[in-house]
């Protein structure tokens, strides 16, 4: 699903955020990217989302070389990718449902179809009952779940997340990871940047570690897998958003 081939990203002034990085993420994997602040985690995700372009090397996403994606084609390219950020940037003058619908409105989806997909996405994150609420009335964890619903409402093949639990307490962080796990179980590929090693180790997923823009030895904590219960989430129809 994702391939980096000798990728270097150098910013003006000569700073190298990534240096000759080669890695791959298979379709259907849930993988974490870890490393110190400034290690290159966000840059790696930005290259996948075409927020940035590599200085050298190739980034291939679902068989498509990002170097060959022209500027006018970037919005269409990004529709295959759901993006979740630590700062979810919700619109506080609009209800939850309209926040989630925004990518569909931009894509020109009909109001009827958009409404169905918004409700399905909110159901998947356990917030269908709050679709008419203002985001300001929600807790920090609920606001992050609105951001996740917005990311998956376009039914992406790939979901990338940059420190999605950075502002949450341990309990809410685990709740968010449980949601990501459920999406992975229905075939979505996930790549998540996080500094929370203790939480990552509980999940038993492959870990890609960066150090000053370079790849370290791969990590896999198969002896620390935790089997999460999904009781807190409504068991919605997975096909509702896939």
Q: What are these model-predicted stretches?
A:
Residues 49:
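Helix-to-loop junction immediately C-terminal to a conserved catalytic motif
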Residues 57-65, 77:
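Conserved ABC transporter NBD signature motif
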Residues 133-136, 154, 186:
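Conserved signature/switch motifs of ABC ATPase nucleotide-binding domains
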Residues 134-138, 142-144:
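Conserved ABC ATPase signature
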Residues 159-162:
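Catalytic Walker B motif of ABC-type/P-loop ATPase nucleotide-binding domains
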Residues 170-172:
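Helix N-cap at the start of a conserved alpha-helix in ABC-type nucleotide-binding domains
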């Amino acid at each position: 699903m994702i391939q980096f081939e000798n990728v270097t990203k150098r910013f003006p002034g000569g700073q190298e955020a990534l240096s000759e990085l080669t890695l791959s993420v298979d379709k259907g994997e849930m993988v974490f990217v870890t490393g110190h602040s400034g290690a290159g985690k966000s840059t790696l995700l930005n290259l996948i989302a075409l927020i940035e372009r590599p200085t050298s090397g190739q980034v291939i996403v679902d068989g498509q070389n990002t170097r060959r994606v022209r500027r006018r084609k970037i919005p269409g390219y990004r529709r295959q990718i759901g993006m979740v950020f630590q700062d979810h940037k919700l619109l506080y003058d609009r209800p939850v449902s309209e926040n989630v619908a925004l990518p569909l409105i931009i894509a020109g989806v009909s109001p009827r179809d958009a409404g169905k997909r918004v409700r399905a996405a909110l159901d998947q994150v356990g917030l269908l009952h709050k679709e008419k609420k203002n985001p300001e009335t929600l807790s920090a964890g609920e606001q992050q779940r609105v951001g996740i619903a917005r990311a998956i409402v376009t039914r992406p093949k790939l979901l990338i997340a940059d420190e999605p639990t950075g502002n949450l307490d341990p309990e809410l962080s685990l709740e968010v990871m449980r949601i990501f796990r459920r999406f992975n179980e229905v075939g979505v590929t996930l790549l998540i940047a996080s500094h929370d090693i203790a939480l990552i180790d509980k999940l038993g997923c492959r870990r890609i570690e960066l150090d000053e823009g370079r790849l370290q030895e791969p990590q896999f904590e198969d002896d620390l897998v935790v089997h999460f219960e999904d009781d807190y989430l409504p068991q919605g129809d997975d096909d509702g958003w896939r």
